[in-house]
Amino acid sequence: MQPNNPNQFTEKAWDAIVRTTEVAKEYRQQQLESEHLFKALLDQDGGLAGSIFTKAGVNLTKLGERVEQFINRQPKLTNPGQSVYLGRSLDALLDRAEGFRKEYGDDFISIEHLVLAFAKDVRFGQQILREFSLDEAKLKAVVAQVRGNQKVTSQNPESTYESLDKYGRDLTQLAREGKLDPVIGRDEEIRRTIQILSRRTKNNPVLIGEPGVGKTAIAEGLAQRIVSGDVPESLQGRKLIALDMGALIAGSKYRGEFEERLKAVLNEVTKSEGQIVLFIDEIHTVVGAGATQGAMDAGNLLKPMLARGELRCIGATTLDEYRKYIEKDAALERRFQQVYVDQPTVEDTISILRGLKERYEVHHGVRISDSALVAAAVLSHRYISDRFLPDKAIDLMDEAAAKLKMEITSKPEALDEVDRKILQLEMERLSLAKESDAASRDRLERLEKELADLKEEQRSLNAQWQAEKDIIDQVQAVKEEIDQVNVQIQQAERDYDLNRAAELKYGKLSELQKRLDAADKQLSETQTSGRSLLREEVTEEDIAEIISKWTGIPVSKLVASEREKLLHLEDELHKRVVGQEEAVRIVSEAIQRSRAGLADPNRPIASFIFLGPTGVGKTELAKALASFLFDDENAMVRIDMSEYMEKHSVSRLIGAPPGYVGYDEGGQLTEAVRRRPYAVVLFDEIEKAHNDVFNVLLQVLDDGRITDSQGRTIDFKNAVIIMTSNIGSDAILRLGGNDAYYEQMREEVMRAMQVHFRPEFLNRVDDIIIFRNLRRDQLAAIVKLQIARLEKRLADRKITLKLSEAAIDYIVEAGYDPVYGARPLKRAIQNELVNPLARGLLKGDFNDGDTIFVDIENERPVFRRLSAMPVV
C-alpha cells in the first residue's frame, strides 16, 4: 500500500508516516523500513503508541535504545542524496494496518492499527516485541483497554481515548496516596452534597461561596470519605474525577474538536454507569466554553445528561460568577442543586489550621506553635477584610513558615558579622604588609592575632550552624517518613491486610517516633543552651510581622524603643506644633490607645474635627501625626473638600456608579484607603463641601467601613480621620485669648457647628477640638521652627545661620496678625530674611561654609559674616 493519501489515515498516524522520511535521513539511510516508522511512533509527544507499550509493561527508554541499535546496524550511505524509497517491510506493514482497520470497522488507519501490524513484521517487529515479551494477543488486549468499544470515525480519535486520564485528575486515587490535605469540619456541606448525589435525577450539587472559603476542599473531603468508606452505599467504591477545563480546551484548533473531546469524556462517565462522579471546579467556565461560530458550547452538551441523571457532576464556583454566568442560563441552573458554602468562624478556622499544621511543618521543616495558628486566624480576620477565611489564615501560616525556613538556610547574623570583620581585617593586612615602619609592623602583628582569633570563632560558629541545620533537616526527614508510613498503614487497613498494618504501626512507626523524639530532644537542648544560632518555631510574632508586610498595619508587639516613643508622643508632636496643648493631648491619647490594643476594633482609631481660625496649626498637626506614624508627612490621604462643592461630586470619593465614565477607576478616598488601610485621612476645610458628602462619611465614622461603587467593603478601622474647619473662627478670635471666656467661646462655636452640620454627623465624631489663636510668645517659637527648616536648606552649602533675639522679635512683629495666625510669619521670613540672603549669595557676599549672623540695626535686619563687618 502506497502511503500517498493522507485522507486514509488519522492525523497522528499520518504525522508518524511523514516523520519516517526524516528518521531515515537522520541515519543516512535511503530505504524507508518498518523500524523507521517504529521510531517515529515512539518519538511522538504523549503519543498513543508510547501509551500502549507503557500499559503493556514495557520500559519506553529501553525500547527506544533497542530500536536505535537495530537502525544503526543497517547499511548507511556516505551521501544518501535527497530521494528516499519505500521499503518492502514498510509497504507490507501498511497493508496489514489496513487489514486491522477493516477488522475493527474503523473509517481511518490509526496509531493502534500500525502498532498491531508490527506483531507480524518479519524484518523487525516480531523480533523486538518478542524481546519485551509481547505478541499480537497481548497488544490487542491493551488496545481494547485503551480505546474501549469506540470506533475511529474522525481523523483525531486519539484525543478521545482515555479522555478522563488526559483531561481529568482522579481525586480518589490522590486521597489513597495521601496527597490531599486533610479536610476538617464542613460535615454539613459534605452530607448535603452526598444527599444530592444520591438522588435519581438532577443529582448534581453546585458548591457556591466566596473565593477561599473551601469549596474545592469539600470535593477533596468527599474523595477522602469515599476512599475510607465513610459514605452511603450509592457512593461506595466510586471514583471522583476533577475535570481540567484548561486541558480540554487547549490545542483544540479545529471546529468541533473541543466538543469531540468533551463528548468522549462524558461518554466515558456515562458508560461507567454511575461509577464515576465528575467534579468541575470553576463550573462557570463551561458556559460558553468552546463556543466558536456555529459550534455548541460545553454547557449545552452537559444539559441533557445532567437532567436525565446519567451524569453525576459536582460543580464549584463563586457567588458572583454563579450569578453572572449560571443564573443567566435558566435551563442549566435548574439542573444543579445549590450547596451554599459559608465562611467558617474564627474558631472553626483555628481547628482547620490545627489539622493542616502537620502538613506545613513537614513541607517547610519547621515547627508551628499553637499560638501562631490562633494569631493567624484572629489577625487575618481582623486586618485582612477583602479576603476570606480559612484561605487567608492558611496563607499567613504558610508564608510565616516559608520566611522562617529561609532564615534557617541563610547565614546567621552572628556568623555574617564575623565574616565581614575577617574580610575587613584581611584587606587591612594586605595594606599593612607593604609598609616597613615599626608602627605598621606592630599593628600588623596585633592584627594577625586578632585575625587568628576571629577565624577560630568563624570555624566554631560554622560548625555550630551546620550542626543545628543537620538536626533540623533530620527532624524534617523523620517527619516525612512518618507521614509516608501513616499513608501505608491506612492503605493496609483499607485492604484488610492487618498483619502489614500492625507491622508498620508497632514496628516501623514506633521506631521512627523514637528517632523523632531523640532529634527533638537534641534540638531543644541546643536551643535552651543559649548558644543557638537558629530558630525553628513559628510564633505569633512571625504571623504579626507578615500581616504588617501585607497591610502596612503595625500589629507586632511593641518593642521597648517604640513603647518609649509612644509615651513621649506629645513631646514629639510639640516639636512641630506650637501651643494647642489640648489638641495634641487628645490626638496622642487616641494613638496610644490604639497601639496598646485598647481601641474599639469596630471603629476607626479616632475621628476628630479640628476647629479654629486659619494658620493656627490644624493641618500641621495632621502632618506631624503622619510624620510620627509613617516617618513621612506626605503619607496621609488628603482630601481637599473645596473640590466637593457640588452634590454629584460625592461619586469622586467612592467611585462613579455603573454606566458612568470612570466606573472602573474607583474612588479617590476608597482606593487610597484600600491600598493603605493604616493611614491618616485628612478632610481639609469640610465646611466648603456639599452637605450630601457627609452622608457618605456617617458609616465611616460609626462602623469604620464604607462600600464603594464596585460593591467592595473598604475598612477604615485602622485609620485616623481628621477633619478641619474654620466654622466659629470669629468667636475663637474674639474670645479665645482669654481663658475666662473659654466656655462661652466653646458654646458659640458648637452652636455654629450645629447650624452647619447635621446632629447625626456631629454625634459620630470622637472629639471636636478647638484650636486657640496664637499668642506672641508662641509665634516666636514658630519663627525658630521655620528658621530651623531654612537652616536645613542651607546645610547643603555648609552655611550656618544665627539670629539674635532682637531679629526674632522683629520677624514676629512683622508677621503678627491675630486674624491670619502663623501664615503671615512665612511671608515675613521670606521678605525680611530669605530674599536679602539670596541676594547676598548671588552677589558673592557670602560663600559656602560661612556662618551668617542676623541682627537688627536702625530697625532693619543686618547680615554679618562672623568676624567680618555688616555686608547688607
UniProtKB/Swiss-Prot annotation:
Species this protein is from: Gloeobacter violaceus (strain ATCC 29082 / PCC 7421)
Protein task: Part of a stress-induced multi-chaperone system, it is involved in the recovery of the cell from heat-induced damage, in cooperation with DnaK, DnaJ and GrpE. Acts before DnaK, in the processing of protein aggregates. Protein binding stimulates the ATPase activity; ATP hydrolysis unfolds the denatured protein aggregates, which probably helps expose new hydrophobic binding sites on the surface of ClpB-bound aggregates, contributing to the solubilization and refolding of denatured protein aggregates by DnaK.
Region (Linker) residue spans: 344-552
Keywords of this entry: ATP-binding, Chaperone, Coiled coil, Cytoplasm, Nucleotide-binding, Repeat, Stress response
Domain Clp R: 6-149
Domain notes: The Clp repeat (R) domain probably functions as a substrate-discriminating domain, recruiting aggregated proteins to the ClpB hexamer and/or stabilizing bound proteins. The NBD2 domain is responsible for oligomerization, whereas the NBD1 domain stabilizes the hexamer probably in an ATP-dependent manner. The movement of the coiled-coil domain is essential for ClpB ability to rescue proteins from an aggregated state, probably by pulling apart large aggregated proteins, which are bound between the coiled-coils motifs of adjacent ClpB subunits in the functional hexamer.
Protein name (record): Chaperone protein ClpB
Keyword Repeat: yes
Superkingdom of origin: Bacteria
Gene3D superfamilies: 1.10.8.60, Clp, N-terminal domain (1.10.1780.10), P-loop containing nucleotide triphosphate hydrolases (3.40.50.300)
SUPFAM superfamilies found in the cross-reference section: Double Clp-N motif, P-loop containing nucleoside triphosphate hydrolases
InterPro entries on file: AAA+_ATPase, ATPase_AAA_core, Chaperonin_ClpB, Clp_ATPase_C, Clp_N_dom_sf, Clp_R_dom, ClpA/B, ClpA/B_CS1
Main location (coarse class): cytoplasm
GO biological process, one term: protein refolding
